[in-house]
Amino acid sequence: EYGLSLKDPKYNFVLIDMKHIKEANEKYILIKKAKESNIICRNALIYYYILNADNPNSQIIKYLVNRGAKFEVHDEGAYGWTPMHFWARRNNYQLLELAIKGGANVDMQTLLDPKSEYNETLLFEAVSEPETYRVTQLLIELGANVNFATPTTPLDDAKGSRNKKLLKDAGAMTSEQIRKKFNLPAYDSSHCEIDGKTDMDLLGKYHDEYSKLLNDAIKKAKESE
């Protein structure tokens, strides 16, 4: 289909039995079941291929995606990362480029809050370390949303002058700049304080509402361009 063969030793998985790969792919995500979520991530079909093939190829990744294999396999730990979020934080831009060109969402979110639609994207992880500016540059070049709000934006969280410059050159704004540009109400979570303590459910709901307000304003502005 892509002019490549899964049996070509150049692109082969590091597994003896190719039939096992075929069966695993037909079952979508996992090579084998495991209780530990980090092992599940490592053994998710696409990630297994990217990390273990002698010469991973984006066309083979597309082949797997078109047959149901998925990138959205999240660690069930504190951060809800996929391996791609780990790569972004660790400056693994080569693996990220391979995955995104193979069909992964350049704005893939964590599952820090599984109930929210506004978790941090790959770009947030990239800009959180000054040394990972090459990942930041790659994600921007591949179309990452530089103004996605959670309700903070990547520019709010960015560390290092190169990350900040890359974001600003791409049109990134802080959440406060977005608020002022579109004349939106100021962030105010004071109502989430009850008897001197923060009600986390109320705060999470307010974060989602305010995130939607910011993101909708950006989206509407883009649509009217």
Range-by-range predicted roles:
Residues 1-48, 57-63, 189, 199-202, ...:
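N-terminal segments that cap or nucleate solenoid repeat domains
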